[in-house]
Amino acid sequence: LDEDGIIDYSGYQRISARFKTDYQARKWLKVGINVGYTNSKTTSNPNIGTSGNSTNLSYYTNNIPPIYPIYVRTYNNGEIAIKTNETTGHPEYDYGTTGAAYTGYPGLSRPFSQTGNPLGTNRYNRSWSKGQQFNATATADIDFTSFLKMNITSNVNWGHSNGTSYDTMFEGPKQGVRGELGKSQNDVLRTNNTQTLTYTDTYADKHNVNVLVGHEYYKTETKYLYAY
C-alpha cells in the first residue's frame, strides 16, 4: 500500500505479510500457528491537529475570512507580488502578527488566529513515523479422551515505532530558536498465555455435564523515549 494523503506533503506506506497453518501431529494432538508482520511509514505534519485553532488545517481554511492573505505581499516594479525570503528564496507566509519570531514586518495584527498559518507550516514542517508490528499465536489441542480435552494458546504481540518531527528554522513559531527537531521511540511487548481443560460427558442419555477449568497469564512491557 502506497497512498498520498488528502493534505499536501502527507502519505502512508505499508507492507504486510501473514502465514497461517495447522498440523495434525497425532490423532490426539493438533497444533497451529498464525504469524503476521506489518511495516509502515506515515508522513504528516507536527502542526496538524483536531482542535479548533490554527493547528487544524480544515478548521482554519473554513473559518478564516477571505480578506486575510496567505502570503506577505510587497510592491515591486509597480506590481504587488508575493515577498520571498532574501536568504532562502522561499515565499513568506503571513502569520498575522508583527512578532520578530514570525515575519517581523510592521503592520496590523490579524484578529483571527494570530501566529497561525497552517499552509505555511505544512509546507516546511514535517513529521515522520515508522512502525513495525509482529504478532504470533500458537495453539495446541490435546485430546486425552473423547470427553477430556485441553487447549493451550500463547500469543506474542510486539510493536516498535520511531517518530521524527521537524519545525522549520526559516519562519513560523520555531524561527526564533532556529528550528526544532524531535525524536521518539516506543516499544511495546505483550504476551498472553491461556490453558483450558474441558470435560464433557452425557449420562443415561439425559444428563449433560460440561466443566471448564482455565488459567490465563497476561503481561505488557512498554519503553518510551522522547528528545528534542
Locate predicted features.
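Surface-exposed loop/interface segments of Gram-negative outer-membrane beta-barrel transport/assembly proteins
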Residues: 6-7, 22-133, 151-228
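Transmembrane beta-barrel architecture of outer membranes
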Residues: 12-18
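Transmembrane beta-strand segments that form the barrel wall of outer-membrane beta-barrel proteins
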Residues: 1-2
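Functionally critical loop-and-helix segments that line ligand-binding/catalytic clefts
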Residues: 143
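An active-site-proximal structural segment forming one wall of the substrate-binding cleft
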Residues: 148
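A cytosolic small-molecule/anion-sensing beta-strand core signal
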Residues: 136
